[in-house]
């Protein structure tokens, strides 16, 4: 299970975005408080941290075994809060990163065949640098991806 948390003392927008994103990908949202990176690594082997720039959520970092492995910089539209089930998410379109990193259906031959045959409720539509997040054809939010950087280990 992946865990999502925020930087310390997040703003209202960041908390709301974190909770909706965690629910979308079936992650566990953890209130960070005074937890250090070591404490978070003790909770889960893989965890995500959302950081703010000027009070808005702007950076999504993936940590594996305490090491930062991925950083996604983005801008965010308004977040629509909806009750969601535990169904898996699927990416539509060519994603710059493997959707499996997020715990979504992978874009392998078998994964693409499955997405054509089964209608999924949670979809991430990738159009260039924009990722549109939908649940039952209702848009939750839109991310405009500014930069994706991988850390070499």
Swiss-Prot record:
One MF term in the entry's GO annotations: rRNA binding
GO process terms (BP): rRNA processing
Brix domain span: 1-153
Keyword Cell wall biogenesis/degradation tagged: no
Domain of life: Archaea
Matching SMART domains: Brix (SM00879)
Keyword line: Ribosome biogenesis
Keyword hit for Nucleus: no
Physiological role: Probably involved in the biogenesis of the ribosome.
Protein name as it appears in the record: Probable Brix domain-containing ribosomal biogenesis protein
């Amino acid at each position: 299970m992946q865990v999502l948390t925020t930087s310390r003392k997040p703003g209202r927008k960041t908390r709301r975005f974190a909770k909706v994103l965690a629910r979308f990908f079936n992650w566990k949202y953890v209130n960070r408080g005074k937890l250090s990176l070591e404490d978070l690594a003790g909770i889960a082997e893989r965890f995500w941290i959302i950081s703010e720039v000027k009070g808005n959520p702007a950076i999504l970092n993936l940590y594996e075994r305490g090491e930062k492995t991925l950083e996604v910089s983005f801008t965010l539209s308004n977040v629509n809060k909806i009750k969601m089930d535990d169904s898996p998410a699927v990416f539509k379109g060519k994603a710059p990163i493997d959707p499996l990193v997020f715990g979504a259906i992978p874009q392998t031959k078998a994964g693409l065949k499955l997405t054509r045959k089964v209608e999924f409720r949670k979809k991430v539509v990738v159009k260039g640098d924009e990722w549109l997040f939908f649940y039952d054809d209702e848009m939750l939010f839109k991310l405009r991806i500014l930069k994706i950087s991988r850390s070499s280990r």
